[in-house]
Amino acid sequence: MATIKEIKAILETIVDLKDKRWQEYQTDSRAGVQKAILQRKKNIQSDLDEEARLEQMLVYEKKLYIEHINLIAGIDEVGRGPLAGPVVAAAVILPPNCKIKHLNDSKKIPKKKHQEIYQNILDQALAVGIGIQDSQCIDDINIYEATKHAMIDAVSHLSVVPEHLLIDAMVLDLPIPQTKIIKGDANSLSIAAASIVAKVTRDKIMSDYDSKYPGYAFSKNAGYGTKEHLEGLQKYGITPIHRKSFEPIKSML
């Protein structure tokens, strides 16, 4: 009789819930075997669910693949709402039908997983571009226009010219066909990839600013108006990276 360890190793090779080998081990009365079967089936179902989710997030891309459009750039931004720091946009071109496990809207992914998924995107992407507009630009032209500028810069920094743009809730003044998608980071893998790249990039910038301007907890709050950040403003005042057109900074001038 095979040991539980040996059976576990065999179960790991099964990837189909309809595989006939399940029946062979289902009759094994050992608790360890039954536990291993349940766990393996759970893992397979989880993988199937993830595959289905990723497939659903390729709907917009697949419509373009049918038209032989393969160089599709997903574009997203991070940092519209914070009181401090830049707005950062990313443009990402993934290979056709590329599925990166657990890729989703950055807001739906635990922060501890951001770096791993970010690295997977960099490893698999055909091209990645970043655009950054600082707080001065945001104050000069407003956050909406600064976001557009950051997105256009991100596209211009791609090493490959895209054939089509999938953009999260924006239309850009660029001579490239584009599709505006509401909640794009939750509905397109290309845009989700851009959201992760933008998020990790901006978090690193804000972490560096935390060292330069201690007392505001920028590495924790990324410039958003948390209690700790607002207390820092009251205690230490405004830094050069604060957005002077945003309240409560505007009223502190």
Swiss-Prot record:
Entries under Pfam families matching the protein: RNase_HII
EC number: 3.1.26.4
Gene3D superfamilies, sorted: Ribonuclease H-like superfamily/Ribonuclease H
Record keyword Nucleotide-binding present: no
GO CC annotation: cytoplasm; ribonuclease H2 complex
Keyword match Nuclease: yes
Single GO molecular function: RNA binding
Stretches that traverse the bilayer: none
Family: Belongs to the RNase HII family.
Protein name (Swiss-Prot/TrEMBL): Ribonuclease HII
